Amino acid sequence: MAAQCVTKVALNVSCANLLDKDIGSKSDPLCVLFLNTSGQQWYEVERTERIKNCLNPQFSKTFIIDYYFEVVQKLKFGVYDIDNKTIELSDDDFLGECECTLGQIVSSKKLTRPLVMKTGRPAGKGSITISAEEIKDNRVVLFEMEARKLDNKDLFGKSDPYLEFHKQTSDGNWLMVHRTEVVKNNLNPVWRPFKISLNSLCYGDMDKTIKVECYDYDNDGSHDLIGTFQTTMTKLKEASRSSPVEFECINEKKRQKKKSYKNSGVISVKQCEITVECTFLDYIMGGCQLNFTVGVDFTGSNGDPRSPDSLHYISPNGVNEYLTALWSVGLVIQDYDADKMFPAFGFGAQIPPQWQVSHEFPMNFNPSNPYCNGIQGIVEAYRSCLPQIKLYGPTNFSPIINHVARFAAAATQQQTASQYFVLLIITDGVITDLDETRQAIVNASRLPMSIIIVGVGGADFSAMEFLDGDGGSLRSPLGEVAIRDIVQFVPFRQFQNAPKEALAQCVLAEIPQQVVGYFNTYKLLPPKNPATKQQKQ
């Protein structure tokens, strides 16, 4: 019998006294959460943000984990000094790790452990603290905030302000729960609208004290406090665009030094609205279908499929990297599609009978019905298609992205969260139409759609990492910003020695969040009430 998820748990991470690996500055740490499923295999679940020049980081990113009472859930927290833009960790300095179980964290509520190196020796005086909270509340708070006349902390130019939100824990300490983006060179900043779960912000208690701090960002990590204020949700939710709630930003040190001190600026809350968000399971149980489409790279760089060196060569036991990636992801996602009929396309090959290069040809060669019956149907279409085509080029992604986007756009005509589209692209390398693909992704970010890219082989995947907006919002060549991060890129070879479920768990990890994010943004509800559906079964 499968384990039943008891609840969801939020994990907050902070570290102290990290090793300093940078010359002339401090380490730029990031924490990676790994999960152990069997034996010695660990797979990456999620990462925090990177904090520059800091040996005592408090990460604002929260890890959300399903808690299974009857399963020993082994976790590993790895801390790395990130000095480059690659997603690989092997080229970053390792600052230490901590292994524990989720049960240990939950039972102690806050667990502090020394960090150790791979050899088991102490990582200097470094330690890690993991705080756990059960998530019981799906209310979120939508904020719009700005400031005016902030103190200038920079000699050359103006302050680069950002906000931090802190809640008070039961032991009286402050825990950071949200950090806004930095607004560069501006004493009257307007921050982008943002949302924080009500539970994260104040444990759902409208009268619990919330502390907001305003800082001037500095590249060297020595961020200057501009000022702070304390409030409650009861006060904050009085805000409206026509009647903002305003707070003086007070710097205590300056107030004590100067009798004439008034404030260090004013923070204005223009919107503070509490709304209830549906969960991923609310949508799935409420009738939302995940529509799965596959795009396979048939460009010449894969090598002649008849040669054992080719990425398209099917080994005597019937597999290659393309098929393994397809099975891994497809087997998970097919359970969320009622008819299990999946369109499958190839790109970058010359196809019969004209032998023209095509970038969105159906692998079953039936343009009016490109659907394959289940994942097995896609595999069969792939196998029969391979000997009938000539691998060619270039590697263009935009046609197949735009193809799926047309269906996603049609689905937006419905007034409920009835359909969401997931495109899996399996490719061996360097993308040719990067500008067109950037534009296609930015356009698709406004649609009920996500894109998974699995890179097979050992090529340079830096362009793929660029499309995966983890380092910041992707922009089109015209400067338009993607309103959501909808691309997840994973190099297949990172999972060669991992359990067969690991690739799917990694690439699909962000899909629930992307589904919920889209439907909640557009205030779309599930087609059917989940409770009603459960009663009928």
From Swiss-Prot:
Its tissue distribution reads:
Expressed in breast and weakly in prostate and ovarian tissues. Expressed in neutrophils (at protein level). Widely expressed. Expressed in the brain. Expressed in neutrophil precursors from the bone marrow and peripheral blood. Expressed in primary breast tumors and ovarian endometrioid adenocarcinoma.
Amino acids binding Ca(2+) 4: 154, 216, 218, 224
For the modification Phosphoserine, the affected residues are: 14, 197, 243
**Residues that coordinate or bind Ca(2+) 3:** 154, 160, 216, 218
Question: GO CC annotations?
Answer: azurophil granule membrane; cell junction; cytoplasm; cytosol; extracellular exosome; focal adhesion; mitochondrion; nucleolus
Task: Enumerate the Gene Ontology biological process terms.
Answer: cellular response to calcium ion; cellular response to growth factor stimulus; ERBB2 signaling pathway; positive regulation of cell migration
Chain positions recorded as Ca(2+) 1 binding sites: 22, 28, 81, 83
Q: Which residues form the C2 domain?
A: 1-115, 124-247
- Compartmental location: Nucleus; Cytoplasm; Cell membrane; Cell junction
Pfam families xrefs = C2, Copine
Keyword annotations for this protein? Calcium, Cell junction, Cell membrane, Cytoplasm, Membrane, Metal-binding, Nucleus, Phosphoprotein, Repeat
Q: How does it assemble?
A: Monomer. Interacts with ERBB2 (preferentially with the tyrosine phosphorylated form); this interaction occurs at the cell membrane and is increased in a growth factor heregulin-dependent manner. Interacts with SHC1; this interaction may mediate the binding of CPNE3 with ERBB2. Interacts with RACK1.
Q: Which family does it belong to?
A: Belongs to the copine family.
Main function: Calcium-dependent phospholipid-binding protein that plays a role in ERBB2-mediated tumor cell migration in response to growth factor heregulin stimulation.
Q: What is this protein called?
A: Copine-3
Species the sequence originates in: Homo sapiens
